[in-house]
């Protein structure tokens, strides 16, 4: 008798739990989303790089940036400790500077030909691509303040007095 009562109580509890869970999901789906999803870093393949950043195969002797906004390109590897250190910084910067710059990521393990074309020998290597100018390269992990300074001065061309530290 005790086993039957226990089984009935467990069944009732399970049904109640699933019924309550389902109502929450329905109400969440019916609510309009007020949260605006901000852009994060964009992972590039070689083909995407050639279309969005620079077609070095078509113009091997001249740098011609194809983007409509300045960008940072992070050449990284998934096993690299310093790469993992700057990944959340780049994620934050992509949100902070959304609409002003692009932040691209190129996995050097998967895109070896692309990394070789730029002579990437150590990672992370960062390529800062301003509009209408030659890109600038930096190697190694940097603190967020250095990224902010480079973005403001190199990419967005803000004078030092206008840059907040």
List the predicted regions and their residue ranges:
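N-terminal targeting signals for export/organelle localization
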Residues: 1-50, 159-165
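Extracytoplasmic/secreted proteins, especially bacterial periplasmic and envelope-associated proteins
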Residues: 44, 48, 71-74, 85, ...
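Loop/turn elements at helix/coil->beta-strand transitions in domains of secreted/extracellular proteins
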Residues: 68-71, 99-101, 131
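Thiol-based oxidoreductase modules, predominantly thioredoxin-like and allied folds used
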Residues: 75, 86-113, 120
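C-type cytochrome heme c attachment motif
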Residues: 78-85, 125
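Non-catalytic, surface beta->alpha helical segment in thiol-disulfide oxidoreductase systems
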Residues: 122, 127-165
């Amino acid at each position: 008798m005790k086993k039957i009562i226990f089984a009935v109580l467990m069944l009732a509890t399970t049904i109640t739990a699933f019924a309550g869970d389902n109502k929450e999901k329905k109400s969440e789906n019916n609510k309009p989303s007020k949260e605006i999803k901000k852009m994060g870093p964009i992972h590039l393949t070689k083909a995407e790089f050639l279309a969005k950043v620079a077609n070095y195969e078509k113009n091997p002797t001249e740098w011609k940036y194809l983007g409509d906004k300045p960008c940072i390109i992070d050449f990284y590897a998934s096993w690299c400790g310093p790469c993992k250190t700057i990944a959340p910084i780049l994620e934050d910067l992509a949100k902070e500077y959304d609409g002003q710059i692009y932040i691209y990521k190129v996995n050097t393990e998967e895109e070896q030909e692309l990394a070789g074309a730029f002579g990437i020998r150590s990672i992370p290597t960062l390529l800062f691509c301003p509009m209408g100018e030659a890109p600038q390269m930096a190697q190694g992990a940097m603190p967020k303040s250095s990224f902010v300074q480079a973005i403001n001065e190199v990419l967005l061309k803000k004078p030092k007095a206008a840059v907040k530290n």
